[in-house]
């Protein structure tokens, strides 16, 4: 039945920035949830409604992969249950290892099989056929979330067992729940919702069970909260504006430079790289803003994922501001288990590089992603060594110089992140260093014609594209470096007439762009 309904509707697109989502799916999901909260006799029905709505949202992309998501949820919950119940501790560790291997294998099969086959054929001159697998949507995200859950379940049990033994030896009542009480239908629904909750399912933020599951249990979140709805609408409007007005239109410049041009002059290359740097930021942060806003409709507070990353004065500061939830995962579940800062300095550098190599490879199966991760790992190691030197010699770099170095490194590294292959990356980099000539002229005739063609198809031509390059750059600079970011507005938890007016204006402009142009997917859907 579900497959039939979805197949009929597949002519439409179910993305945050589409009319079908904004005017149909979201209102139905919202109303259904709070109606059930108010009138359902069984308190599990509202949670079940959200789980089913989230699964429908996921299945809309490709219903064939719905069993994969459901199977992953059931399997990981079962493994966590066995970790909780099994004695002795050695068997707990075996269940944890089994769960980790299964999750990594599932992700590796879909994401990296073709990459390894291609490179194996290249090295050994063999002719194994690639499988041309379609990457299941969100698999990189829900896999990480469940890996963290398994590891934390294991660590929590390691802490609980000595405490329980201590209580027994003291002949005191055991306050901790016995292992058999771990499973319940309510707890399973909380877990399923933690993994599948549709605002964050597809591209994050990478949520942690400790910050999500208690919110699903909180009875105060079961009632309509008009302040949360108003604030959520405001944050959603910011994200929608970032996506459809800025990111989608900046993409035209980046796509031309990376995919269409055969060579790039100095100005063209820098315009290409900067366009992608801002496109990626506004696209991904726009998605996260929209996810946070939607979460607030349901009284669920998702973690902040961006904090003005392009204002960073060093690469460490950048990773405290960019994709914050991924940085948290890499730190807590890779860097610290490898020794963190407690090991010898050379080992710390090795760990930094290794962690970011894995982080780069997590983003995509390609040498360009590996190089991007390697560059960031090396940069973090260099920054760490530099920080030690500055403390020793009492030297401080001027802030403007520190910002210029940091931003330009980030912009350069994004070239590898965006390029389809090394040849495309080198094409842009050659232009950026002036190997194709340093010219202060306008874009080539081909690029100009392309931009003019884009302009003619836009309703907002007279407002936004009278001088496309200049006005878009001014808008991006103002938003990125001058205005308060959405995380500050989110944390303020207050609505006033300025925010209300801004939300109405941003939504109006966003809707104009939605109906004036074709919808595009979010960039991080590809990862």
Curated annotation (Swiss-Prot):
CC annotations in GO:
plasma membrane
Name the UniProt key words of this record, in alphabetical order: Acyltransferase, Cell membrane, Cell wall biogenesis/degradation, Membrane, Transferase, Transmembrane, Transmembrane helix
Q: What organism is the protein native to?
A: Helicobacter pylori (strain ATCC 700392 / 26695)
Q: Name one Pfam family in it.
A: MBOAT
- Protein name per its UniProtKB record: Peptidoglycan O-acetyltransferase
Q: Does the keyword Transmembrane apply?
A: yes
Q: What class of enzyme is it?
A: transferase
User: Which family is this protein grouped under?
Assistant: Belongs to the membrane-bound acyltransferase family.
Report the InterPro entries cross-referenced here. Answer: Ac/AlaTfrase_AlgI/DltB, AlgI, MB_O-acyltransferase, MBOAT_fam
Its encoding gene is what?
patA
What EC number(s) would the UniProt record show?
A: 2.3.1.-
Main localization of the protein?
membrane
- Where, per UniProt, does this protein localize? Cell membrane
Q: What is the deletion mutant like?
A: Cells lacking this gene contain a greatly reduced amount of acetylated muropeptides in the bacterial PG, and are more susceptible to lysozyme killing than wild-type.
Query: What residue ranges are annotated as transmembrane?
Result: 11-31, 55-75, 96-116, 131-151, 187-207, 228-248, 280-300, 352-372, 397-417, 463-483, 505-525
- What membrane topology does the annotation report for this chain? Multi-pass membrane protein
Residues annotated as catalytic: 363
Q: Single Gene Ontology BP term?
A: alginic acid biosynthetic process
Q: What does this protein do?
A: Catalyzes the O-acetylation of peptidoglycan (PG), an important mechanism that appears to confer lysozyme resistance and contributes to pathogen persistence in the host.
Q: What domain of life does the UniProt record list for this protein's source?
A: Bacteria
User: A Gene Ontology molecular-function term?
Assistant: acyltransferase activity
């Amino acid at each position: 039945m579900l497959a039939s309904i979805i197949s009929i509707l597949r002519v439409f697109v179910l993305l945050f920035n589409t009319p079908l989502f904004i005017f149909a799916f979201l209102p139905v999901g919202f109303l259904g949830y709070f109606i059930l909260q108010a009138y359902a006799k069984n308190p599990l029905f509202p949670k079940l409604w959200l789980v089913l709505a989230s699964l429908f949202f996921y299945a809309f992309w490709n219903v064939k992969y719905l069993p994969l998501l459901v199977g992953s949820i059931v399997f990981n919950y079962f493994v966590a249950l066995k970790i909780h119940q099994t004695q002795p501790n050695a068997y707990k560790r075996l269940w944890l290892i089994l769960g980790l291997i299964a999750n990594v294998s599932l992700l590796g099969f879909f994401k990296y099989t073709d990459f390894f086959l291609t490179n194996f054929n290249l090295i050994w001159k063999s002719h194994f056929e690639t499988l041309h697998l379609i990457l299941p949507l969100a698999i990189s995200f829900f896999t990480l979330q469940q890996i963290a859950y398994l590891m934390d379940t294991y660590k929590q049990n390691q802490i609980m067992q000595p405490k329980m033994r201590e209580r027994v030896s003291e002949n005191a009542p055991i306050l901790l729940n016995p292992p058999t009480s771990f499973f319940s239908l309510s707890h399973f629904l909380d877990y399923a919702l933690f993994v599948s909750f549709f605002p964050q399912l597809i591209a994050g933020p990478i949520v942690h069970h400790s910050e999500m599951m208690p919110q699903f249990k909180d009875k105060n979140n079961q009632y309509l909260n008009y302040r949360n709805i108003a604030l959520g609408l405001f944050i959603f409007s910011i994200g929608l504006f970032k996506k459809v007005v800025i990111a989608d239109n900046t993409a035209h410049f980046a796509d031309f430079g990376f995919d269409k041009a055969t060579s790039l002059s100095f100005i063209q290359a820098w315009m290409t790289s900067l366009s992608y740097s801002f496109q990626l930021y506004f696209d991904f942060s726009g998605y996260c803003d929209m996810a946070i806003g939607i979460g607030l409709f349901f009284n669920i507070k998702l973690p902040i994922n961006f904090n003005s990353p392009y204002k960073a004065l060093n690469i460490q500061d950048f990773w405290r501001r960019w994709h914050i939830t991924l940085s948290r995962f890499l730190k807590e579940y890779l860097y610290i288990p490898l020794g963190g800062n407690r090991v010898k300095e050379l080992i710390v550098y090795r760990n930094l590089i290794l962690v970011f190599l894995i982080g780069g490879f997590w983003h995509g199966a390609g040498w360009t992603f590996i190089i991007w991760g390697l560059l960031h790992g090396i940069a973090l190691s260099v920054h760490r060594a530099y920080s030690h030197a500055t403390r020793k010699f009492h030297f401080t770099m001027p802030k403007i110089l520190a910002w210029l170095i940091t931003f330009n490194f980030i912009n350069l590294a994004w070239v590898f992140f965006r390029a389809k292959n090394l040849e495309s990356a080198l094409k842009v980099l050659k232009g950026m260093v002036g190997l194709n000539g340093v010219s202060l002229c306008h874009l080539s005739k081909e690029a100009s014609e392309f931009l003019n063609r884009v302009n003619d198809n836009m309703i907002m031509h007279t407002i936004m594209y009278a001088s496309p390059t200049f006005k878009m750059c001014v808008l991006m600079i103002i938003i990125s470096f001058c205005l308060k970011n959405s995380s500050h507005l989110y944390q303020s938890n207050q609505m006033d007439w300025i925010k209300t007016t801004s939300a109405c204006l941003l939504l109006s402009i966003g809707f104009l762009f939605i109906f004036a142009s074709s919808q595009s997917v979010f960039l991080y859907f590809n990862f």
